[in-house]
Amino acid sequence: KPVYKEKLRLRTYGQCAVDNSPAFLEIKKKFRGITYKRRFELTYKELHNYITDGTPPDKRGQVFEEIDYMIRRMSLKPKIVICYDREAYYGKDDKEFRLTFDGNVRFRRDDLDLRAGDHGEYLITQPYTIMEVKSAGAIPIWLARTLSEKKIFHGSFSKYGNIFANEIRQKYKVGV
């Protein structure tokens, strides 16, 4: 695995973005197993205008400038939309603890405007679900015991990485 990884994500929540929906530009960096995430909030209309014609939002800050520099330096353009149905749970006593379940993961490489809805080709369907556990420290002992009893063990899964790997397999007919 690489020591350093960096990705840019454009994100909205809900089934279909509208012009005044909250939207986020996020930089996610992973260095030696530690993930750092910085995000900038704007409306979907501002995000769409910025991505399509370079018009920056009225309100900017350090995080936006960092993202803007990254986009310009690397000539980044949106390439894929990934949608999923998420259930998220937060710790009652530990606000740093979060448990999420992502199901019905779908994607599309055309029609990249998020106002077009959450349609796409399925990557994962029921009964399969991605479970993610996030915690600033050790996970709660009750969860560790439950996962162990159910023989659920740590693994990694990248939605984008798996879409890309599937496309490569299809292209070269490897393992199909």
Question: Where in this protein do the model-derived segments appear?
Answer:
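Phosphate-end processing signature that detects enzymes handling 5′-triphosphorylated RNA
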Residues: K1-V176
